[in-house]
Amino acid sequence: MWKQKGAQGNDPYLYSTNNFVGRQYWEFQPDAGTPEEREEVEKARKDYVNNKKLHGIHPCSDMLMRRQLIKESGIDLLSIPPLRLDENEQVNYDAVTTAVKKALRLNRAIQAHDGHWPAENAGSLLYTPPLIIALYISGTIDTILTKQHKKELIRFVYNHQNEDGGWGSYIEGHSTMIGSVLSYVMLRLLGEGLAESDDGNGAVERGRKWILDHGGAAGIPSWGKTYLAVLGVYEWEGCNPLPPEFWLFPSSFPFHPAKMWIYCRCTYMPMSYLYGKRYHGPITDLVLSLRQEIYNIPYEQIKWNQQRHNCCKEDLYYPHTLVQDLVWDGLHYFSEPFLKRWPFNKLRKRGLKRVVELMRYGATETRFITTGNGEKALQIMSWWAEDPNGDEFKHHLARIPDFLWIAEDGMTVQSFGSQLWDCILATQAIIATNMVEEYGDSLKKAHFFIKESQIKENPRGDFLKMCRQFTKGAWTFSDQDHGCVVSDCTAEALKCLLLLSQMPQDIVGEKPEVERLYEAVNVLLYLQSRVSGGFAVWEPPVPKPYLEMLNPSEIFADIVVEREHIECTASVIKGLMAFKCLHPGHRQKEIEDSVAKAIRYLERNQMPDGSWYGFWGICFLYGTFFTLSGFASAGRTYDNSEAVRKGVKFFLSTQNEEGGWGESLESCPSEKFTPLKGNRTNLVQTSWAMLGLMFGGQAERDPTPLHRAAKLLINAQMDNGDFPQQEITGVYCKNSMLHYAEYRNIFPLWALGEYRKRVWLPKHQQLKI
């Protein structure tokens, strides 16, 4: 059986800044589990397949991890009897209290011993294939991946194949060329054959048919072209230039990569190395076979130069501008021929040397986690090409388990983990219940994790020269070892520490030193845009919109420059206002000015219908929930703010007949609110709307819409306190969705806890913030 492990480092090429607190990985133990437990796992796998067929639910429920942690906790989840409200029965205090207690008990049971809540953070079908390609070209695929790994990786790909035979870019998406080609290639590299696939339904052959019916792999978007070129089943001549020489320009250069969004910068960095070296792996019999399998004409007859701008229409979301195509053509026809010849090839060598220097620095400062799975796979490819026997390659291999996640739908590569983000949201949800004394042990563990996850030092040396920012005092999305600042994680973590500081230390643990709070404030104030007043994610926003014209991805939007985001801005307002409340006098004027600018940014970016567009969740419901919470913390209310009134009106106008809310993922690329098909309800999104309405004062004015939504949540709760997994609710870059498996527990608990506190409990002393 598979076992989830955590807070351990068992490899000489692993190292940590905090003794691996927050690390999570999976290990196969052949002798683990009773026959009954193994049967439960198989049942979970069958239930997933049936649920997907009957109800169209693609995301996993994380059943393998949950079953393990629930058993290890020893908590009896069925000791509180289930509760259902009849059609004509109204919500009452006892009903909501029972639902909250059951949800709290489940959350205690699935909390890891180091304080975080392990959960899948995945959903993209573009995450895993690059890693498999990296392992294949380096000859390590059979040493890093066991038979059990391969079996579960294959299971995942088969489970998420679409009816038409193709695969999407993410698990709920329509079939695309990049999703289909990469999934097909991955299956073949893992040993699946053409004649008959293990699923008994000819899945490999059906996938190949979709690819050929839609023009063949030559139409794969640019990221896919790079991956295939490294594997050796596409020619570099068919890729638009990614010159490493760009890294040699002074930082004042208008198009210097240092001005790019960190994830874009760090992804294209190893891409430019691989392009500059024209590297490809060994041309094996399987590679030669793939060359013939995925194209409509013989490989030798393909005119590669004509494929540089070729992108399948099913994939195209962000078309190249004419200016961009002229830039690529100019580099391809004029620069590249010179850089291949002496003496200009010396410039290429200098560019490659600089890229290697930057890759090494970035990998070291993230403990070889890198900024995410995209860079991770590309760095593995690059270090294999640079020095197969080097320590960098070995360090990278040692961190691969951190990216592999297994659930009932199989094994996949996840982002880099959402440990900190899930923990700080869950912590606020627990605090909102007002049952702290009853469930304080859970808060004590979460408190420990949050404190241990704060970054304690800046990157070493001249980090600005290495395209990095200061980090001391910040929190990441995952754990301290990741080392990359995230604005909303820092703000929400700061608020958690401030909330917990008002509670008895014998219940929630010791407070952090106040200097740690000051350092977090320093980070937040630094991250604000001096122009707009908004906040981005990793670094201060870059007011260089012309750079977005060079977005080469075709499938993602807003990836080139660091942009402000609604939800990040709202979270920072919450964090700064909470700090000001408990620590007046420290940088008070700067905090007040910062919050005032941030509020103006939010007011300027409100949609005509009263909503706000969220970048990291779907989408208008998500953005509006965060914004109203930010406004509430800054004293903006329904009575004194037109923006709040419009936001509340948006929520009330989009509530469906059964009392819930549901928003389709189509809202994200279209940037227009789109209800779920049939105007059905999503429980997580319903919770967002409930919370947003309560932050907008709806409980005091007219709680009727909240009663309807609360009844829906109570009746949807399962006997063990869990809530059913429904549609995917996360997103990034407007056109790719992300599954946050813990959301279905965090947000219904938070919404019901806040509802119970605001509607049903008598007025009494609350926390100050």
Curated annotation (Swiss-Prot):
It catalyses: dammarenediol-II = (S)-2,3-epoxysqualene + H2O. The record marks 421, 477, 616 as: Transition state stabilizer. It comes from the Eukaryota. It is a single-pass membrane protein. The keyword Oxidoreductase does not apply. Its EC number is 4.2.1.125. Keywords: Endoplasmic reticulum, Isomerase, Isoprene biosynthesis, Lyase, Membrane, Repeat, Transmembrane, Transmembrane helix. The active site is at 488 (proton donor). Expressed in flower buds, leaves, stems, petioles and roots. Pathway: Secondary metabolite biosynthesis; terpenoid biosynthesis. Transgenic tobacco plants coexpressing PgDDS and PgPPDS1/CYP716A47 accumulate dammarene sapogenin (protopanaxadiol, PPD). It is found in: Endoplasmic reticulum membrane. It holds the Pfam family SQHop_cyclase_C. The keyword RNA-binding does not apply. The chain crosses the membrane at residues 612-632. GO terms for biological process: response to metal ion; response to molecule of fungal origin; response to vanadate(3-); saponin biosynthetic process; triterpenoid biosynthetic process. PFTB repeats lie at residues 457-501, 518-563, 595-635, 644-685, 706-747. Monomer. Belongs to the terpene cyclase/mutase family. This is Dammarenediol II synthase. It comes from Panax ginseng (Korean ginseng).
